[in-house]
Amino acid sequence: MSDPRTAPAAVTPAGAAPGAPLLDVDGLNVRLPIDGIHRPVLREVSFSLRPGEAFGLVGESGSGKSMTARAIDRLLPAGAQVTGSIQFDGQDVSALTGAGLRQYRGRVAMIFQDPRAHTNPVRRIGDFMTEALRTNMSVPAAEARARAVDMLGQVGIEDGERRLRQYPHQLSGGMLQRVMIATALLTQPRLLLADEPTTALDVTTQAEVMAILDDLRREFGLTMLFITHDLELAAAICDRTAVMYAGQIVEIRRSSLLHDDPLHPYTAALAGARPDIAQTAHRLRAIPGRPLSAFEAPQEECAFAPRCPHARDVCLAAVPDLLETGDGLSRCVRTHELRGKLQAVADA
């Protein structure tokens, strides 16, 4: 099988040694207990992030994006069966326990898509923000609060002392998400896992929050795994992007190429389904069928074949490997012959 970790990146950050990723996910498989049976939710997921790189995970709901992030952060539900390898800075994440796991979580921060679902309504903002500093890094309470006030200022929240005394319900959705970003950055992480951080916000607030997140990521030199269902947003934010479908990665390449020159029929269909405000009376293009979860998808053939207009008998013969294309990776046995046609689909 081709190694997704060799896929080209748009940039090699200064000081990053080629072949020395900060995060290396290799052959990750996750099965969860569903209706009394362990069913697959991730299948052979492999990718790596170089220091300072922004890497996107794109796909529809249920494709496995968030589950991948939770596996990296060791936040999978009880009873999960995990195989494969997750290496962070050369350490086996699955082997970490106790103090080692707490230290790891200080170096890997996560921003969730719904801030209200991940804050305690009866705890003040200050307690929430400083908890990781106090418990994982043994920072004194007064110093932790001072750092929190400073970080609130960096995400555009004034009067930080007053905000620390408030409760989550006293803040707007956009302001609370800024608090989540500030909290994630307080421990000076090396890796930021951003799980659709603007989904619950209105369009204007989304743009403001994304600008803050991208600016601070660049300022602090963070590596970021950015999860989204929006192909255009990934192209604007990320150096490289992996497209996921039914628990598998189906394409990895430079983000700027995903729309104009897709390698996989699913990527082309996603790009073609986007609304175009420049066209009037334009019927939205929908992908036939419905998105499948990993345990619903065919196990012995291409998972996208039931919805793919380009599927042939060869697509039903086996689960395709991620194939090298010279400028990326694609899980489609017809990539080379379809390339021009897929570009037309994306542009339609």
Residue ranges and their predicted role:
Residues 18-21, 158-162, 252-348:
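Short catalytic/signature loops enriched in Gly
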Residues 186-190:
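A short, proline-enriched helix->beta-strand linker immediately N-terminal to the Walker B motif
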Residues 166-171, 175:
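Conserved ABC ATPase signature
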Residues 77-81, 93-109, 127, 135, ...:
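ABC ATPase NBD coupling module
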Residues 91-92, 142-162, 271-272:
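Conserved ABC ATPase "signature" region
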Residues 74, 193, 197-282:
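P-loop NTP-binding/switch modules centered on Walker-like glycine-rich loops
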